[in-house]
Every structure is written in structure tokens, then in C-alpha cells.
């Protein structure tokens, strides 16, 4: 077993930790056995050295081990729609809006998220604003997925062991490995995923991590300028894991008959209230950039979740989900379901 001090010495010498060593180290941190000063040194050392696929995979596997899981007999059809955050773009809650549209098109969505770190509004913030109850038990979340097609897992409720590292993370003031672990540790075990990241380098890295963790169909995306969504302003880098193989390619809005925008100003918001207003406009069928970016991201989620055979088919299904009124009804159904447990 590696000690925290040995790990620190390895990292400051610019040497990577082997999978078993990272597993041991992570278990010690998640069990509260590593003092804050050493956690800070470990996170700093990993960041400076740059985390490897093996180190991230080991850390994610341990986080899953310690997580409070959602008990579902059949998780094979589940899809998660999630972003790392950290892009600083201040856009409205695109992935949360896409969740309702995807569910309206027949997807079973198990969304894992938290409060805002760098954005104007996190998934949990906007869900609370719309009246949803975030504090469901794992069993109630499983029931929500079965009944409404949507389950929201509020990250702090499922990763209580994070309390041992959270204060250090906050005090460091820079991105650490934990910024990318959240989207890799879905408590419902969703094997399919649309994952937005803040740097194109992470597309290849995290697709390989998810491959090793046993994911089935994943699209890891990074929009031009570091947006952790499929963007409207130009190309989006995609790393797709499917049938055990990874392929990387670029997509653009015009590939799907959607107008490329010069900037994202039309979809930026200042706070949670504005984000919910923008979401409601999309679900009400209002045309514009907000609708278009939701169509693109929902299409990718439907494709990742194997509901749509292609991104183009996904666009059609997403459009129909909104225009039929089913997406708006799905939001109301989900909120109503959660409130019965308030």
C-alpha cells in the first residue's frame, strides 16, 4: 500500500501513480485518513504532472465504490446528460433543458449534478427554482426514473465521503482531478452518456476512462472556445465510444440544418431565475438560439442513449418532443413526482 507521503514524493518527481496505487490513495482520502495538508499536496502534484487515464480511472472507480447508489434492476438503457462545468460561459441550463426533451422523446435519463461552481446556474439550482425536491432517497429516484423517465441525483446526497476532501478543494482555488470525477461517477450506473468538457484534450482522455469503466455508448464533447456543450458558434469536437471503440470527429450546426451563430450572447444568463425563464421559453416552443442549442444537445443524448440511430434522427425527435408539448409536460410531471416526497 502506498502512503500519502510516498505518493507526494512520486508526484513532485513527475512520476505517475500506478492504478493500484491510485486506488489505495483514493480510498485513504475518501475514508478521512489523509490530513488536509497532504490532500492539498496530492491534488496539486496531480494537476502539475497532469492526471493520466489510469489515475483518473482508478479515482473514479473508488468514488463509485463509496457512492450511495440508485437501485435499478435494468440500467442498460439509461443515459446521463452532464458537463464538467468550468467553461465560464454563463449560458442557461442547456443540459437540464435537454433532459426534459430527451425524456419526452423516450429516453430514460439519470442525471447526476450539483450546484453552480463557475456558471450562472447549476443543475440543482435551476431544479430548486422550478420547485423540484432534490432530496429523494435512492429508492425514490429509481421510482422516478421508472415512472417519469427522469431521475436527478443531487451529487452531495450520493457522495458523502467527499466531505473529507471538499474543504481542501475549495481552498486550493484551481481545478483538480475532482472537477472531472463527478461526471464519471453516476450513482445509477448509466452506461450511456453525453458528457461536455471544458477542453478538447479531455475528449480523448475521458472517453478512454469511460471505456475502461465499462461505459457502452458515450459522446464526450467540447464546443469551440471550451464550451462544455455542443455549440452553435462553430465546430464541436466529439470523442465517441461505441461498441468498445473510440472515434474522434468534429460536427458543426450546419451539418444538421441549424444556423451557426456569431456568439452565444442570446443564451447567456445572469442568474438562476433567468436560466429558468430561458428553459421555459424553449419548452414553450419559442424559436431562436436557445432552442437550437437544446436541439443539438438533446439529439446527441438520444443518440448516446440509443433512442435515435443518428444525430440527424435525434434532431427530428427532439424537435417533435418540444413542438408536441410533451417536453413541457415531462418537466411538470417530474417536478410533481418529486414534490410528493417533500
UniProtKB/Swiss-Prot annotation:
GO terms under cellular component: cytosol
Keyword Magnesium listed: yes
Cofactor: Mg(2+)
Functional pathway: Amino-acid biosynthesis; L-tryptophan biosynthesis; L-tryptophan from chorismate: step 2/5
Cofactor stoichiometry and binding remark: Binds 2 magnesium ions per monomer.
Keyword Glycosyltransferase among record annotations: yes
Family under the similarity heading: Belongs to the anthranilate phosphoribosyltransferase family.
Protein name: Anthranilate phosphoribosyltransferase
Organism: Neisseria gonorrhoeae (strain ATCC 700825 / FA 1090)
Taxonomic classification: Bacteria, Pseudomonadati, Pseudomonadota, Betaproteobacteria, Neisseriales
Amino acid at each position: 500500500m502506498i502512503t500519502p507521503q510516498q505518493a507526494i514524493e512520486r508526484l513532485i518527481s513527475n512520476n505517475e501513480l500506478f492504478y493500484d496505487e491510485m486506488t489505495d490513495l483514493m480510498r485513504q482520502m475518501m475514508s478521512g485518513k489523509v490530513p488536509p495538508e497532504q490532500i492539498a499536496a496530492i491534488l496539486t502534484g496531480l494537476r502539475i504532472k497532469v492526471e493520466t487515464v489510469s489515475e483518473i480511472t482508478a479515482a473514479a472507480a473508488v468514488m463509485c465504490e463509496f457512492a450511495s447508489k440508485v437501485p435499478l434492476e435494468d440500467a442498460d438503457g439509461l443515459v446521463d446528460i452532464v458537463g464538467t462545468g468550468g467553461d465560464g460561459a454563463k449560458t442557461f441550463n442547456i443540459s437540464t433543458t435537454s433532459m426534459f426533451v430527451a425524456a419526452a422523446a423516450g429516453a430514460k435519463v439519470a442525471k447526476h449534478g450539483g450546484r453552480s461552481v463557475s456558471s450562472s446556474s447549476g443543475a440543482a439550482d435551476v431544479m430548486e427554482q422550478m420547485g423540484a425536491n432534490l432530496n429523494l432517497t435512492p429508492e425514490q429516484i429509481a421510482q422516478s426514473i421508472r415512472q417519469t423517465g427522469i431521475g436527478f441525483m443531487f451529487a452531495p446526497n450520493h457522495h458523502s465521503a467527499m466531505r473529507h476532501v471538499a474543504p481542501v478543494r475549495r481552498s486550493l482555488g484551481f481545478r483538480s482531478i475532482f472537477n472531472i470525477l463527478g461526471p464519471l461517477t453516476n450513482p445509477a450506473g448509466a452506461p450511456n452518456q453525453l458528457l461536455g468538457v471544458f477542453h478538447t484534450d479531455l475528449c480523448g482522455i475521458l472517453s478512454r476512462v469511460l471505456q475502461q469503466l465499462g461505459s457502452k455508448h458515450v459522446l464526450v464533447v467540447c464546443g469551440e472556445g471550451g464550451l462544455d456543450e455542443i455549440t452553435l458558434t462553430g465546430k464541436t469536437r466529439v470523442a465517441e465510444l461505441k461498441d468498445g471503440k473510440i472515434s474522434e470527429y468534429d460536427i458543426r450546426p450546419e451539418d444538421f440544418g441549424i444556423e451557426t451563430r456569431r456568439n452565444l450572447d442570446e443564451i447567456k444568463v445572469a442568474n438562476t431565475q433567468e436560466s429558468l425563464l430561458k428553459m421555459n421559453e424553449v419548452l414553450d416552443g419559442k424559436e431562436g438560439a436557445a432552442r437550437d442549442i437544446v436541439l443539438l444537445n438533446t439529439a446527441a443524448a438520444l443518440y448516446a442513449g440509443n433512442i435515435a440511430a443518428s444525430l440527424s434522427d435525434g434532431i427530428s425527435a427532439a424537435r417533435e418532443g418540444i413542438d408536441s408539448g410533451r417536453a413541457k409536460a415531462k418537466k411538470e410531471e417530474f417536478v410533481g413526482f418529486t414534490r410528493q416526497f417533500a
